């Protein structure tokens, strides 16, 4: 369900893993998710000794899953070669799906990046040391996100949380594979040095959000023939966490979402306005197989005092399954505050708001791929100067069948931006109720802006003393005991 919410529509069953259950494929059928199914060989293993047993497993698996409409593609291995006779067997048993020998052939290049990089490198297409990766189809492209502080506390002792115990954190990051105690920490510190794990984890969500947004939006920009390079898609590596780790993704092993889920969902909405940190341009993406004419995209820029210092609009005609690239350029005023904010609004020809987007940006110059500099990466210390804001919250609870819902309406009643707010549905012990499904989270509100969010969970997950919490960068936390 989180996958469906994120907007991701193709899942890779990696060759080092398994063939999923019938229930998994049934869910993919129902949710409209496609599956890239690899068989059980990887580049770091040998071919099986018992070929007959292997081919028997391929046959039984294909017979079991071939009638699922979600099954899109067969791949014989991950970064290896095929067992002789595999394509012939697949043609005999199915013959209706595409096939390739391994994950990095037939015009599909090898993957990366996997670790933390400067988010500016996604726009520049220098994130991989192997060369250009924002082109064609990429089978492995991704970045980490720190889990929420509640997950971190469940993962290790308080003494190892803060100050960060590098040995423990690296152990929980595959011997430091994703660079969480090095580059990720350095980038988090560009939001200001933290004095507690709570503060560090909050800033870690900001970096995770930028990681995801920069990846998906640069691929949006280069969709098909519309951008600087031809891009047909990517498989996010890796999609889920198979164990507790400090390098999370859109959600943690325990099904606790991170900011990356909601910023990915925003980036992959079917009609989407987006900003390019390298070009300072605004583009509009259309994933529908129909065109839309006379849409209006508006870009607003606010300084650190929430004063609007720039606003410009452009009328765009959106081609079917296409992109209106560089519809307008944002001209940041001379003397603008070191940290500032960008609000994008997309409206249809009748003036109805279709979507919106929000960014934080610094004046720091990008000095190249060997640095941790740039307007998406550094110079955010002045966020600590953001003045206090106020958000008025009202909610209603309802029940439908076995599920419990909290419908929340929020409005920024101040003249200051309410930055990076998080809703939480907690039990009496102030631990997150999991899984709970939020229609949005980790969001910002401009002065006067209104927002609605619905939280859903199973009734069986509820307990006495359930709490609704709203907290944020520059608002006082609010707590409500739900009945």
Predicted segments — roles?
Residues 256-285, 302, 363-401:
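Low-complexity, acidic Ser/Thr/Pro/Gly-rich terminal tails and inter-domain linkers that flank the onset
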Residues 295-297, 303-337, 433-460:
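Intrinsically disordered, low-complexity Pro/Gly/Ser/Thr-rich segments with frequent PxxP/GP/PP motifs
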């Amino acid at each position: 369900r989180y996958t469906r919410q994120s907007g991701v529509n193709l899942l890779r069953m990696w060759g080092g893993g398994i063939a999923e259950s019938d229930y998994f494929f049934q869910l993919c059928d129902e949710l409209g998710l496609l599956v890239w199914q690899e068989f059980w060989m990887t580049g770091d293993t040998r071919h099986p000794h018992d070929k007959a047993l292997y081919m028997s497993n391929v046959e039984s698996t294909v017979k079991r899953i071939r009638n699922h409409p979600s099954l899109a593609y067969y791949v014989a291995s991950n970064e290896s070669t095929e067992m002789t006779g595999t394509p012939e067997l697949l043609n005999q048993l199915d013959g209706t799906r595409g096939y390739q020998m391994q994950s990095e052939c037939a015009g599909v290049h090898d993957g990366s990046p996997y670790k933390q990089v400067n988010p500016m490198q996604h726009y520049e297409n220098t994130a991989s040391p192997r060369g250009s990766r924002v082109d064609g189809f990429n089978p492995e492209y991704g970045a980490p996100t720190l889990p929420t502080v509640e997950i971190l506390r469940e993962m290790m002792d308080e003494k190892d949380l803060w100050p960060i115990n590098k040995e423990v954190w690296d152990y929980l990051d595959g011997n430091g594979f994703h660079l969480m105690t090095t580059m990720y920490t350095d980038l988090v510190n560009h939001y200001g040095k933290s004095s507690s794990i709570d503060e560090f984890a909050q800033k870690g969500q900001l970096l995770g959000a930028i990681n995801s947004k920069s990846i998906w939006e640069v691929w949006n920009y280069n969709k098909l023939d519309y951008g600087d390079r031809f891009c047909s898609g990517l498989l996010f590596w890796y999609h889920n966490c198979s164990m507790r780790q400090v390098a999370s993704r859109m959600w943690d092993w325990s099904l606790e979402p991170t900011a990356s889920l909601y910023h990915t969902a925003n980036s992959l909405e079917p009609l989407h306005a987006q900003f390019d940190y390298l070009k300072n341009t605004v583009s509009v993406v259309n994933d529908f197989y129909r065109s839309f004419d006379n849409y209006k995209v508006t870009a607003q820029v606010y300084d650190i005092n929430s004063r609007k210092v720039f606003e410009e609009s452009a009328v765009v005609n959106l081609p079917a399954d296409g992109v209106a690239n560089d519809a307008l350029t944002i001209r940041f005023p001379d003397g603008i505050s070191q940290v500032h904010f960008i609000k994008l609004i997309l409206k249809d020809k009748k003036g109805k708001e279709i979507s919106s987007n929000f960014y934080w940006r610094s004046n720091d110059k990008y000095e190249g791929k060997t640095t941790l500099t740039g307007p998406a990466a550094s110079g955010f210390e002045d966020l600590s100067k953001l003045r206090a804001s106020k958000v008025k919250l009202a909610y209603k609870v309802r029940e439908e069948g076995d599920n419990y819902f909290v419908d929340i309406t929020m409005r920024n009643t101040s003249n200051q931006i309410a930055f990076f707010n998080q809703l939480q549905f907690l039990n009496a012990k102030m631990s997150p109720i999991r899984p709970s499904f939020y229609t949005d989270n980790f969001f910002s509100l401009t002065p006067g802006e209104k927002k609605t969010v619905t939280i859903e969970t199973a009734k069986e997950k509820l307990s006495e003393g359930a709490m609704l919490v709203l907290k944020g960068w520059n608002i006082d936390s609010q707590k409500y005991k739900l009945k």
